[in-house]
């Protein structure tokens, strides 16, 4: 092979641009020398440094980068608060429950065991803001996610399928159907959102009315295989979505992985950030988690869990503690004199 160019190129996802995206015509520059052309290849270490630099600004990889869905929802949240202030309406229609000395209200959602129903609602709301507040100029589209080219049902796709934004309830019903049929957990929903934002960042695409279902389906498919111990097979999704083929599911999964650059790792810090940002999104949109008064049984359970964690922490500190020897018990190796003739 050497410096020669190989004719064997791996198949990549087909790109399609909308009316807003135009490609400039390619004009070859005859003044370029041989060193400035393809023979001057970039070293792999340089590419790794660039990837590390970009990763710091990618919310799905770096815990300090703010999530995309939360930033996209800020405009709508400010408009809602402004309209409520102008119309002199209270900020929330649902009366909030506040804890007192005698009663403590807690929800049953934790970072390790989130509430399934409300987590799916929050993820659907995050996807809704992604679609609603997408780039107005339009970005690159991929054929594998186009519902007109790869329909999920045999019913005819309407001609204006890419014009109308889906409602939050429609997104919620689609995600809930997949999670209920496949018996997926709430943690899988959070990982689904991580993969979705990672896809939008890596592939530099937008989620829109034409592709949101297949993007969400691909993210759920991948998250269920990575997160759950008993992964759902592609043929199982074909039984849920009756009109889709196994070959289409396999191709969707393959191209989704390629666009993610096979980066399916989700650090615990990134997972926790997405969980708490989803809670912030729910609070800003009056989508509060169900609160229940703290009962005696639940208090004993929380106390037992805290004691267990405290005992584990003490054991770790005890095992990590270094032991020092005193001068009384200190023994040094003795060397016997050697005679060199």
Curated annotation (Swiss-Prot):
Keyword Transmembrane appears in the UniProt entry: no
A single GO BP: positive regulation of autophagy
Domain of life: Eukaryota
Pfam short name (any one): Cyclin_N
Lipid-binding residues (covalent, N-myristoyl glycine): 2
Membrane topology of the entry: Lipid-anchor
Phosphoserine modified-residue sites: 21, 25, 33, 71, 73, 83, 99-100, 102, 280, 288, 295, 324, 326
Single GO MF descriptor: protein kinase binding
Predominant location: membrane
Keyword tags: Cell cycle, Cell division, Cell membrane, Cyclin, Lipoprotein, Membrane, Myristate, Nucleus, Phosphoprotein, Ubl conjugation, Wnt signaling pathway
Gene3D superfamilies xrefs: Cyclin-like (1.10.472.10)
SMART domains with a match to the protein in the record: CYCLIN
InterPro entries: Cyclin-like_dom, Cyclin-like_sf, Cyclin_N, Cyclin_Y
GO terms under cellular component: cyclin-dependent protein kinase holoenzyme complex; cytoplasmic cyclin-dependent protein kinase holoenzyme complex; nucleolus; nucleoplasm; nucleus; plasma membrane
Cyclin N-terminal domain span: 143-265
Post-translational modification: Ubiquitinated; leading to its degradation.
Record PTM Phosphothreonine, positions in chain: 30, 37, 67, 75, 331
Compartment annotation: Cell membrane
Subunit text: Found in a complex with CAPRIN2, LRP6 and CDK14 during G2/M stage; CAPRIN2 functions as a scaffold for the complex by binding to CCNY via its N terminus and to CDK14 via its C terminus. Interacts with CDK14. Interacts with CDK16. Interacts with LRP6.
Stored PANTHER family: CYCLIN Y, ISOFORM A
Described purpose of this protein according to its UniProt entry: Positive regulatory subunit of the cyclin-dependent kinases CDK14/PFTK1 and CDK16. Acts as a cell-cycle regulator of Wnt signaling pathway during G2/M phase by recruiting CDK14/PFTK1 to the plasma membrane and promoting phosphorylation of LRP6, leading to the activation of the Wnt signaling pathway. Recruits CDK16 to the plasma membrane. Isoform 3 might play a role in the activation of MYC-mediated transcription.
Protein known as: Cyclin-Y
Organism field: Homo sapiens (Human)
Organism taxonomic ancestry: Eukaryota, Metazoa, Chordata, Craniata, Vertebrata
